[in-house]
């Protein structure tokens, strides 16, 4: 251990202790000068003298860091201690009188570490025994808090107040259980009956004693439930949960997820007793909570480090713990542990499966042993009573070997092609040989079985006569019961014996008339050659076809043929199995002579008979032969014909009609009843209430305003027509003026050319120069620009007024025609506008 030392008061900096610092360890037997020891600080980081060096401050004379010397509680405790120390000093050195003991006004509660322990107390606390570390020292990795928790991991620990209440409760419970007074003390001199005495014993409840562990468990459940459901109880005590809300935690099995250990404690016992205990503990817990002002009964440590100035924070870190980085070696070790865990789990699963397999094998062997013993007992019973006999099933149960029974060979009916004579003979020979071998094998097996039975069951029968008489009596009684049952059911039809109910014949069958109705003597006739009876006589019906044509339909008679020997060819099986429905060829058409009938009967082969049979089944609608879409014999070839004798249709008809089936055949009056109810409801219905808010009526049109509006529209239309007419006139005038101006220019040019030619002819003999001087080509204008003179003549300036023009007669005529057309168009447009206005006025008035 590091030697305790005095507080260093020097101002020099003490070297911090790191993982590389060498320390001196003193033992109890060593003599150490405590005044020479120094107090050092542990440095978690070797390089902490850098940016965090200001946090590692020197420890002063008070034993705390210099940064915490100004803490309020520490200063108050130091001041109180200094006052106490000053008051204990004597007033003078020579005075012997002791000063009165003074108490600290404020102190920090710390355990008293002053003084030395006596040898007797030390020997009791620290015995001189050698510690031996066990081989299973490390068992689990739970923390101290987890290890010290109670049932279910709940961390409630009872204090002195809880202990006093629990002792009082248990003492009262034990005292109340022993206060049962006797009959003599109660003054009852009469004797009590046994039933009353038992009743009194049953009415006395068992004493309810609560153990400390059970008390801590109940209080822990109350605390955890309140912490989860009422975390703000310290602000409002009305949120305290009642006992009815917590009773289900004790009267019913508690959920493992509610407990911190996720395991239900095995020591709980009966739930009813647990609920009684919780009901008695609840008032005490409630009072403790109210005393704590809704806070937890056990004070909670403050681990919140957000506020550095809070002095009540427990286990504060002096230095910021550095974040440790994950290294490759750590990952490797983790991977190795994971691999080891996977291998151990695989080995455990494999061992578990092997154990399961061996258990199944054991159960299988036990079952086989029981089966063998049952067979042996059954065999002994048969051997002791040989009169009981032995069947093939019983022999199979005893020996375990099934009896080989050859299957019955039935020729296949799927073949349609008859075999030839050579193929048929070879097939019959092979089948005969095979049957002979199977018969010989079966005979040998029967002989061997009879020999074994005669060897095992040989000797005289040991069955007593009483057993035989009893068997005969049982057989006679059974026969009498069957006869009596038959007499009772004589007038009843058993639906189990005949479950099939044939369908009623169709209307087409009723329309056919048999020849027996016309000639009753033919009903007793038979076939003269074979003597076969007639099953279905020949019948006819008359029907009217399309176009009013009368048609006669007939059905030939069907005879009951005799069944001969079993055929050898598969093609002969349909005729041999169903002879009654295979009509002969002579029955399908009208014979012409007797010789023809005999020849047809002789020439008809089994193949032809099978073909006729297939055709009959295919097209016979009454027998269900025509099945599918488009197989009908009527005009509607697309109708679907089904087989009424098929299993999915016949299963609805094999039982008798019930009352519910008859109800389905009646008409449904639901729609009529519903309609009648609706009419009655409409007749009795009250008129709808008048609405509170009604829509205001539309305003009536004012005829004066309409007339004024119509007149204004007419005036606007007339004004638009006048403007359009004036526009047309102006356009016509402009066109006429342009034409007149063009004609005037053309005439002026023609006159100028004529005058120029005349002058040239008159003065043709003159000098050219004089001619040029006398008649210049251009006249100078005031602005200095010479005006052109076409053909030696100066052009006149254009006239701006219309009055200066004088139009020729043809231009005047053309202008008049254009103006007349414009007036006609304007008058026509005005007439159309007036008609539209009149129609609009009529529609608005309507």
UniProtKB/Swiss-Prot annotation:
Any single Pfam family the record assigns to this protein: EPL1
Coiled coil: 434-490
Cellular component GO terms held in the UniProt record: NuA4 histone acetyltransferase complex; nucleus
Biased composition (Polar residues): 411-426, 774-796
Keyword annotations from UniProtKB, A to Z: Cell cycle, Coiled coil, DNA damage, DNA repair, Nucleus, Transcription, Transcription regulation
Region Disordered, residue ranges: 169-204, 391-466, 587-609, 682-702, 759-804
Key word Lipid metabolism present: no
Main localization, broad class: nucleus
Intracellular or extracellular location(s): Nucleus
Membrane-traversing stretches: none
Top-level division of the source organism's lineage: Eukaryota
Entries under InterPro entries matching the protein: Enhancer_polycomb (IPR024943), Enhancer_polycomb-like_N (IPR019542)
Extent of Pro residues compositional bias: 686-702
Biased amino acid composition, Low complexity: 759-773
A GO biological-process term: DNA repair
Family: Belongs to the enhancer of polycomb family.
Subunit structure: Component of the NuA4 histone acetyltransferase complex.
Listed PANTHER family: ENHANCER OF POLYCOMB
Biological role stated in the UniProt entry: Component of the NuA4 histone acetyltransferase complex which is involved in transcriptional activation of selected genes principally by acetylation of nucleosomal histone H4 and H2A. The NuA4 complex is also involved in DNA repair. Involved in gene silencing by neighboring heterochromatin, blockage of the silencing spreading along the chromosome, and required for cell cycle progression through G2/M.
Protein name per its UniProtKB record: Enhancer of polycomb-like protein 1
């Amino acid at each position: 251990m590091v030697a305790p030392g005095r507080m260093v008061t020097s101002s020099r900096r003490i070297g911090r202790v790191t993982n590389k610092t060498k320390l001196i360890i003193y033992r109890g037997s060593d003599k150490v000068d405590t005044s020479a020891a120094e107090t050092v600080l542990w440095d978690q980081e070797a390089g902490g003298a850098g940016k965090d060096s200001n946090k590692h401050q020197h420890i002063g004379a008070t034993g705390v860091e210099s940064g915490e010397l100004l803490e309020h509680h520490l200063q108050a405790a130091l001041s109180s201690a200094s006052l106490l120390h000053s008051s204990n000093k004597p007033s003078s050195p020579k005075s012997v009188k002791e000063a009165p003991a003074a108490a600290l006004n404020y102190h920090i509660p710390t355990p008293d570490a002053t003084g030395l322990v006596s040898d007797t107390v030390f020997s009791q606390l620290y015995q001189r025994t050698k510690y031996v570390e066990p081989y299973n020292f490390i068992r689990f990795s739970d923390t101290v808090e987890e290890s010290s928790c109670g049932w279910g991991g709940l961390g409630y620990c009872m204090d002195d107040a809880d202990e006093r209440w629990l002792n009082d409760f248990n003492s009262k419970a034990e005292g109340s259980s022993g206060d049962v007074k006797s009959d003599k003390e109660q003054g009852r001199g009469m004797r009590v009956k046994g039933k009353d005495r038992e009743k009194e014993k049953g009415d006395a409840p068992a004493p309810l004693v609560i153990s400390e562990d059970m008390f801590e468990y109940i209080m822990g459940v109350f605390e955890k439930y309140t912490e989860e459901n009422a975390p703000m109880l310290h602000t409002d005590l009305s949120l305290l949960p009642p006992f009815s809300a917590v009773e289900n935690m004790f009267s019913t099995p508690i959920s493992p997820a509610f407990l911190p250990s996720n395991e239900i404690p095995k020591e709980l016992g009966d739930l009813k007793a647990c609920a009684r205990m919780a009901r008695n503990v609840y008032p005490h817990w409630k009072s403790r909570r109210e005393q704590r002002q809704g806070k937890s009964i056990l004070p909670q440590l403050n681990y919140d480090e957000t506020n550095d100035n809070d002095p009540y924070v427990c286990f504060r870190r002096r230095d910021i713990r550095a974040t440790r980085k994950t290294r490759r070696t750590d990952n490797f070790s983790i991977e190795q542990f994971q691999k080891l865990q996977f291998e151990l789990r695989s080995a455990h699963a494999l061992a578990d499966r092997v154990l399961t397999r061996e258990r199944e094998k054991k159960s299988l062997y036990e079952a086989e042993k029981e089966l063998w013993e049952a067979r042996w007992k059954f065999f002994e019973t048969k051997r002791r009573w040989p009169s009981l006999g032995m069947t093939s099933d019983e022999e199979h149960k005893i020996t375990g070997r099934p009896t080989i029974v050859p299957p019955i060979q039935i020729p296949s009916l799927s073949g349609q092609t008859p075999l030839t004579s050579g193929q048929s003979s070879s097939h019959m020979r092979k089948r005969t040989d095979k049957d002979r071998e199977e018969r010989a094998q079966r005979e040998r097996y029967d002989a061997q079985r009879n020999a074994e039975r005669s060897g095992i069951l040989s000797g005289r029968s040991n069955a007593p006569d009483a057993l035989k008489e009893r068997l005969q009596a049982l057989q006679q009684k059974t026969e009498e019961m069957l006869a009596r049952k038959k007499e009772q059911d004589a007038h009843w039809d058993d639906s189990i014996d005949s479950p099939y109910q044939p369908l009623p014949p169709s209307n087409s069958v009723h329309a056919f008339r048999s020849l027996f109705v016309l000639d009753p003597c033919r009903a007793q006739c038979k076939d003269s050659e074979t003597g076969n009876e007639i099953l279905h006589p020949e019948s006819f019906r008359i029907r009217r076809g399309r176009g009013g044509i009368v048609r006669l339909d007939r059905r030939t008679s069907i005879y009951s043929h005799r069944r001969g020997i079993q055929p050898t060819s598969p093609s002969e099986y349909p005729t041999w199995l169903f002879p009654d429905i295979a009509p002969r060829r002579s029955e399908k058409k009208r014979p012409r002579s007797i010789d023809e009938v005999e020849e047809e009967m002789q020439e008809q082969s089994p193949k032809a008979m099978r073909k006729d049979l297939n055709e009959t089944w295919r097209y016979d609608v009454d027998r269900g032969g025509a099945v599918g879409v488009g197989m009908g014999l009527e005009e509607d070839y697309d109708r679907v014909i089904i087989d009424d004798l098929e299993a999915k249709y016949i299963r609805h008809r094999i039982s008798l009609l019930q009352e519910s089936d008859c109800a389905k055949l009646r008409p449904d009056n639901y729609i009529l009843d519903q309609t009648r109810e609706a009419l009655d409801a409409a007749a009795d219905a009250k008129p709808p209430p008048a609405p509170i808010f009604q829509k205001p009526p539309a305003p009536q049109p004012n005829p004066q305003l309409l007339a004024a509006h119509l007149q204004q529209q007419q005036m606007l239309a007339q004004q638009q027509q006048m403007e359009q007419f004036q526009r047309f006139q102006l356009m016509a005038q402009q066109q006429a003026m342009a034409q007149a101006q063009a004609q005037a220019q053309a005439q002026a040019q023609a006159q100028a050319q004529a005058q120029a030619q005349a002058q040239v002819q008159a003065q043709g003999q003159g000098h050219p120069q004089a001619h040029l001087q006398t008649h210049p080509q251009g006249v100078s204008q005031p602005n200095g620009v010479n005006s052109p003179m076409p053909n030696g003549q100066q052009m006149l300036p254009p006239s701006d007024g219309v009055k200066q023009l004088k139009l020729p007669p043809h231009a005047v005529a053309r202008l008049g025609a254009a103006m007349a057309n414009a007036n006609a168009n304007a008058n026509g447009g005005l007439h159309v506008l007036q008609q539209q206005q009149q129609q609009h006025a009529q529609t608005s008035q309507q």
